[in-house]
Structure formats: structure tokens, C-alpha cells
Amino acid sequence: MPRKKSAAKKAREALVQKKVINSNVPTDKKSIDQLQENVTSKSHLLEESSSEDEEINSFQINEEYAKRFEHNKKREELQKLEAKYGEQMANGVDGEGSDESSSEEEEDSDGELVTPEVDAAILRMIVKIRNKDPDLYDSQQKYFDEVEKDVQGSLKSKDGFRSVTLKDYHRQKLLSGEILDAEEDEPMPNDANPTHVEEQERLRKETIAAFHDVNGNKDAVSNESDEDGDFLVKKEKTKKQLEEEEHGYERFLLESAQSKEARKVLEDLSSSYVKQRPSVLVNTEDDENGIKPSDEDFLLKYMMNRGWRTSNTKQPSYEEIIDEVDAENRFDEDAEEFENKFNFRFEEEAGSQIVSHPRNVADSLRRKDDSRKRARDRKKERLEEASQKRLEEVNRLKNLKRKELEEKLNQVIEIAGSKNIDVSKLDLDEDFDPEKWESKMSEIFNENYYEEDSAKKPEFGDDIDIDDIAQVDNGSEDLGSIENKTVEDTGNREKSKKSLRKDIREKKRKIDEYVEEKYGVPEAVIVKNSKFRYQQVAPETFGLDILDILNASDADLNNYVGLKKMTPYRTPEEIARDKKKYGKKKRLREWKKQVFGK
């Protein structure tokens, strides 16, 4: 398969052909053939040259030069970093470590770095200022350079001192073997009970110690009391020790002053020398400025005794300790509250609570829309009016029926001629049935009716029988008997009135019962379109107790008493019959034995 020409070769061939065509060459066949041979030979030369170019383009990496270049690059980068961050990066100390070391440095709030030399230099400068020394006006004069160098040297020496921790101390003791030797020297503890002699010796020592405690002499048992554990007792300082501490720094300055000049200045300014001779700081301008010697002594005492330092000799009271603890707790609470407010400053207040609003807002301008409520009220009023109207119509119907029935019954009683007729058996509005009518008539007009009719007293006319009157006038009865008869007649009349009223009430009651039964309207018809009302049903267990009902299954209960026996529409006679039938104790015992096995 022939090799395809590249784009560069095609471009070169096209360029050569273009030059050949543009040149003044002959157009005969021989010359053209020669020209083609030249072109092919040149194309072969171009192919050879391109292959040589490809060999030249394939290069190799010089490893020695690459190593030297990388080494120089690293040195250049190292120099840049050292110039930017200093020598700390070269020594392996980064900026964070320096920050931590600087943050760990405590602030010199008590002036611990103020050495005696520094105090001497300060006091020397005060003397020169008060005396207006001309050297102060020399700008090249430096007073604190040497002192600062000494302080820096002392700081470096302190930094160079390596603190020994408890862990290092124990490691050193273990390596030296001192702890092992001490353990070997210690006697082995006696776990057994003490002997009688040891017990007596211990009791004797306790008695002696108690005797010395009573007499106030505790020196004899000081060693034993120390062994009891009360050896960490704070030592109370005497008045002399407090005075020595107060003036101790003054003596410390005098003892620790290294240069003779500093010692001389401190001796001159010492409070002990101030009492013996006039002060060195005396100036004629003090009297003019109102400066008193007492003020000068106060200044010297303040400087010499380090008055700016707080005294720790005073023991805080219980109230002060409690107040300090409370103050710390309040500070922590305030800090926590501030932090919470700051962290949640963009959140809404009470965001976790659901905001509720009242249904009836007093100050709201919203128009009340209670049209549906008013419609319900109107409907309720219409129903109540209709129910009241229906009830009035029923009552009017009852009254009319009562009057009509009374007229009919009065007519029947008047025709029958007897007041003891049972009118409750009569139904004057029902359809006429000859057989029922005959049976009711036979019940009403029975033997009692005819016996009452025969026993009825005869009625007399308006004519008066003279014979009867003559017999009364001519009789032998006295006035007492006549009065007794009059009283009896009066009592009979009262009884007849009572019986008459009783008959009227009984008649009215029977008529009302009859009208209510025949023409009475039930309450459900009167109160129409009302809500459903449950019917009150008397509870009945048929001899079962609560545990039997709860423990038994529905099938067992239905087997004992069916649900049909619990319907509310059953008549009282049916309820009484079922209660008598299903409430028998024998049947209940058999059912319990069958269900519960007892």
C-alpha cells in the first residue's frame, strides 16, 4: 500500500509545478518529458529532505542540564522565601508558632521586669529633672540603653533555663535508682492484727497525747499530730514579718544593686535615710508650687515599696468570696446572653412560636359578615313559630272536641237517667258497627244500672200532704230530736256536695283522657324538622353482672339473650315476660358453667 503524502509535500509540489509553468520553457513533447523527469527527481529529493527533518525534530532530554536547572530554581525560591519571611522559616519556626509563643507570654501587670537597676535609673532621671541638669537637653545622651541591655540579658537567661516538670523529676529518680533503694529500705507492712503489747503501747500514747492536749502543751505529740494529716496548715505571719515584707523591697534594691552608682542613688533615696537627713530632692521651687515634704515622702515610699502592687496579705471573707463567684457567674451569663443575641440577631423574635390572633379584633376595620348567622337565626325563629302555631291549633282542636264530647255524654247521661255510666267505653266518632254497639250497650246498661233505677226514691209533687204535717205537729217528739235530724240533714247535704264535686272531677278526667287518647298529637309531630331525639330505655342485664358482660364474647351473650330482646319498641308486657324468662337463676348458672366453666 503506497504511503500517503503529507500536506507539506503537496504544497511543495504545487509550488514547484507553478514555477515550472510560469517559466519560459518550450512546449514540445520532448521538453515536457524532460521536465516531468526533473519534477519527479526533485520530489524524491524533497521526500529525503523531509525524512531528515523528522529525524532532526526528534530530540533527547539532557539530564545533567535538567538537574542543574532544578537545583538553581530551588535556590532561587529559597532565597525569595527567606527574604520574605526571615530566618525563622529557615530554622523551622513558622509564624503560627511565633504567634502562639507571643500569646503565651504574660503581660507584666505587676511590674516584674522593673529591676532595681531600672528603678535606680528612673530615680536618677527624676533627680536630674528636678535639678534641671543640662545633660537632659543633649539629644545624643542615652540613659536607659545599658539598663535595657541588662533586662534583655536577664530575660534571655530566663528563657534559656529549662523548667523541670514533675514527669521529668520522676524519670530522673527512676533512672538514678533512688526510688528502688527507698522501697527496699521501707519495712514490710504488717497486715496481721497487733499484739497485746502493741495495743497497750498505742493506748498509752493516746492517753499521754490527750493529757498534753488538755494542758495546752502540744510539743510532745507534734510528730504524732503531723502524722494524722493536719500538716498542711497555713502559717500565720507576725507583725514583724509583715513589716519586713513591707520594707523588704527597699533592702532588696540595696542588696541587688550591681553598680556603685545605682547603689549610691538608692541609698540616698531610701526611706531610712530620708528620716535621718534632708531629702536629696529638695528644691526651692517646691515651696512656691505648694509641694510639702510629706508629699515627697509619700512619693519616695511609693516608689521604694512598690505601691502599685496589690497586697495579698488580706484574707477575703466568706461574703467577698461568694460575691466574687456570683460576679463571675453573672459575667458568664451576660456573655452567653450577648453571644446568643449576636448569633441570632438576624432571626425574628419568637420565631419558634406560632403567632395566634383573636377571632374578634376590637380595633379592626373589617366589616363583619354574619349573613349566614342571621339566616340561621331567622330559620330557627320560623321553625319555633310554626311549632308554636301547630301546638296552639292542636290545643284548640282538643278544646273543641272536649266540648263536643261533653255535650254528647251529657245527652247520653240525661237520656239514660244515671250518673254512674262508664263513658270511657264509648267512641262516638268511630264507624257504626251493630255488633260492637250492642256489646258496649250491654256493658254500660248492666244489672247495676237497673238495680240503681229500682232503688231510686220516688219524686213528690209540689202539693203538700196535710196529714203528714198534722202528724208532725201532734207527735210526741221533743225539740232535741228535731235538732238532731236537722244536723243529720246538714251533714248529708255536705256529703252530697262533696260527692258531686268528686263526680264532676272524675268526669272531666275521663273526658280528658279520652280526648288525649283519640285526638292527641305526639310531640314529634308538633315539633317538626327538629333534631333526632333518642328514646330513653331502661337498662336491663337479665341477671348478668359487669364482669360476665366484659369477659364473655358476643356469641355467648347472643346465645344467652338475643339483641331482639333489647329493642326499644317492645311493649312493657313483652319486656316483663322476657325479664321473667331470661332472669332465672338456674338458666344463669347453666350459662356461666358452659361459658366460664364454673
From Swiss-Prot:
Its biological purpose: Required for 40S ribosome biogenesis. Involved in nucleolar processing of pre-18S ribosomal RNA.
Lineage per the UniProt record: Eukaryota, Fungi, Dikarya, Ascomycota, Taphrinomycotina
Modified residues (Phosphoserine): S222, S225, S476
Designated name of the protein: Protein kri1
Pfam families: Kri1 (PF05178), Kri1_C (PF12936)
Underlying gene: kri1
Cellular component annotations (GO), alphabetically ordered: 90S preribosome; nucleolus; nucleus
Region of interest (Disordered), residue spans: 1-36, 83-117, 177-200, 353-384
Organism: Schizosaccharomyces pombe (strain 972 / ATCC 24843)
Compositionally skewed regions (Acidic residues) per UniProt: 96-111
Major location category of this protein: nucleus
GO biological process terms held by the UniProt record: endonucleolytic cleavage in ITS1 to separate SSU-rRNA from 5.8S rRNA and LSU-rRNA from tricistronic rRNA transcript (SSU-rRNA, 5.8S rRNA, LSU-rRNA)
Family that this chain belongs to: Belongs to the KRI1 family.
Signal sequence region: none
Compositionally skewed regions (Basic and acidic residues) per UniProt: 364-384
Keyword terms: Nucleus, Phosphoprotein, Ribosome biogenesis, rRNA processing
Subcellular location: Nucleus, Nucleolus
